Amino acid sequence: MYDLILRRGLNKKKVTVCIILLILLVTLATISGIRFAEHHEVKKQAKLYEEQQAQIRKEEEEKQRQEELAKQAEINKRIEQTSRAFTDEEKDRIKHIYRSTGEKRVFLTFDDGPSETVTPLILDLLKKENVKATFFTLGTNVNNYPDLVKREFDEGHYVANHGYSHKYSTVYASPEATLNEYNYTEDAIRKALGNNSYMSKLFRFPGGSNGGYYDEAKQNSKALLHENGIMHLDWNSLSSDAAGEKTKEALLQNVKDTMGEKDSVVILMHDSSDKILTYEMLSDLISYLREQGYKFENIYDLLD
């Protein structure tokens, strides 16, 4: 009897152990299955993520490619516009730039540059504000800082001509002397841009095209320039930054006072090495012009 009871007890223990082992096996199998499923899902999600990232990279690369194509197309257009003579229609638009067109527009222009101290700051700000300007460059400074001239062109600004020396007695010695000053600077610009076909065809007379001691010489020079297909451009608003103003607030007020209620405004400023106040004022000027509803343009906007 005792042996029977003992055997039954052992059998019971065996059954219990078997049940426990079975439970453990089922549990392990379940855990393994869950982990396998989780691992499979992780791999699936990882693959999906990689595919999504690859698609994003592909789209970004395509977007970048399209932007580069658009940028190159713009550069090619600017090269074409500056590799030929102005049409009669383009000359008329420049000649009558101050004429109202039914909308408010403003041309920011900078003389006497480039300079290594002020011009880069102005270019950085214009790029940030997405504003294109017109730079009337001095030949001597073009030779000194060709990379800045190249940057001006590459970033969509119009590179125009302000003569080579800015010495009135030299520039206005004769009409031929004025033309020589123009040509010397054109050669410097072409060299800076690495483009032998570049022609700005646009000159700003040092001191303006009218008045002063050299007025008669200016008129004679103007006629010779026009005979050679070269237009000139003055201004109808200015910051007076060349007059020694001491604060950026004074510069801004000068622009406001001289532009008045004009619809088409050409603002004279300078980017020579001592005109840091012009840069410091520029952000406020851009904000003011936008508040007044002006659209920013440069000479390219007058060309076909």
Identify the residue ranges that each predicted region occupies.
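Generic hydrophobic/packing signal
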Residues: 57, 63, 68, 74-78, ...
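Active-site beta->alpha N-cap acidic-glycine motif
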Residues: 77-177, 181-191, 196-201
